[in-house]
Amino acid sequence: MENFLIARRLVEAGARVVSLNFSRWDWHGDNFKIARNDMPMLDRAVSALVEDLSNRGLLNDVSIVVWGEFGRTPKINNTAGRDHWPQVSCALLAGGGMRTGQVIGATNRLGEYA
């Protein structure tokens, strides 16, 4: 989670773009165990970054994008994981003056196709 603090410090120092990596998201197996470990940490780290930037008056000037390069299968595979699924993906957007509390886009009922 230290890399989130470093990202904030880089923004304060005037960096125009900061990219960071958190965990390893290629969960082809043991999806539930890994998610129970990693997702709370990601939630705390992103929440702290948003709050930190807001408290410093920087949030409207910084766009935060939490995103992977493709989605995961809507169905669990035989090793309790999810495989690559380029048909649907998701991203979390914050800051940058964006309106909050919205969902953009939709999938079918099973999350298979947009």
Pin down the residues of each PLM region.
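Ligand-binding pockets and gating/stacking loops
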Residues: M1-A114
